[in-house]
């Protein structure tokens, strides 16, 4: 069974470094068998974080501070209105990190379907995507949830960031996840009404429990070619 812990939303958002220390402490407890599998759900004050594969050109050009972290993926933003989830869970044998990422994607895709939003995986790209339209009217993929993880001693850290009611202008200063031919979006933008992290938590909880309590099951949601690839 997976324990879902909501630790800071809205005005009670948790600074990124403080949350990282909580992750590390809980990771050590799960590794040692002192704690059960847990997902931490929270919001952060505005911050940029860069995974191990971040390129210099991905970063803000104006010297805005960036926190470098030991997760996979590249640079992204966290801040008010975005729901962040940190699953600290023991993976089954044989170890399959990609399958863990796919399970997180499945939980988020199921949540979006419950909200009436069609979303998908995109071939060769992690996260959850919505087929949108660029300013020039051409089709493009728009990321609504980013995923980046780390695994040590078979136990995961880091996780996902789901854009709910956050503004999107912070992404204009970076190359989100290092992907130049796609956009970003949010649940509120897609639905045309405000959907906050607090609104999402009770809906997401059962999808996370289902996905992460059945670690040996492979997800079935197919990946689609990128919109950019389809135009090529």
Swiss-Prot record:
Cellular component annotations (GO), alphabetically ordered: cytoplasm
Known role: Catalyzes the transfer of endogenously produced octanoic acid from octanoyl-acyl-carrier-protein onto the lipoyl domains of lipoate-dependent enzymes. Lipoyl-ACP can also act as a substrate although octanoyl-ACP is likely to be the physiological substrate.
EC number: 2.3.1.181
UniProt xrefs under Pfam families: LplA-B_cat
HAMAP family: LipB (MF_00013)
Species per Swiss-Prot/TrEMBL record: Clavibacter sepedonicus
Location(s) in or outside the cell: Cytoplasm
Binding site for substrate: 71-78, 146-148, 159-161
Record-given protein name: Octanoyltransferase
Catalytic activity as recorded in UniProt: octanoyl-[ACP] + L-lysyl-[protein] = N(6)-octanoyl-L-lysyl-[protein] + holo-[ACP] + H(+)
High-level lineage: Bacteria, Bacillati, Actinomycetota, Actinomycetes, Micrococcales
Keyword entries, A-Z: Acyltransferase, Cytoplasm, Transferase
A Gene Ontology molecular function term of the record: lipoyl(octanoyl) transferase activity
Name of the encoding gene: lipB
């Amino acid at each position: 069974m997976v324990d879902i812990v909501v630790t800071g939303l809205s005005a009670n958002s948790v600074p990124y470094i403080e949350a990282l220390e909580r992750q590390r402490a809980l990771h050590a407890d799960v590794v040692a068998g002192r704690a059960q599998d847990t997902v931490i759900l929270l919001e952060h004050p505005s911050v940029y974080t860069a995974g191990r594969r971040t390129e210099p050109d991905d970063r803000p050009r104006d010297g805005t501070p960036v926190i470098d972290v030991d997760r996979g993926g590249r640079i992204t933003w966290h801040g008010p209105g975005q729901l962040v989830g940190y699953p600290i869970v023991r993976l089954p044998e044989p170890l399959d990190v990609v399958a863990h990422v796919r399970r997180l994607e499945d939980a988020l895709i199921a949540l979006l379907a419950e909200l009436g939003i069609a979303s998908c995986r995109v071939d060769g790209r992690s996260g959850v995507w919505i087929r949108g339209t660029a300013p020039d009217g051409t089709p493009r993929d728009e990321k609504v949830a980013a995923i980046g993880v780390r695994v040590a001693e078979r136990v995961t850290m880091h996780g996902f960031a789901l854009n709910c009611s956050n503004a999107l202008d912070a992404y204009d200063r970076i190359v989100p996840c290092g992907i130049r031919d796609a956009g970003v979006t949010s649940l509120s933008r897609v639905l045309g009404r405000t959907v906050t992290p607090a609104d999402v938590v009770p809906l997401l909880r059962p999808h996370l429990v289902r996905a992460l309590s059945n670690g040996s099951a492979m997800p079935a949601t197919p990946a689609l070619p990128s919109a950019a690839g389809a135009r090529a």
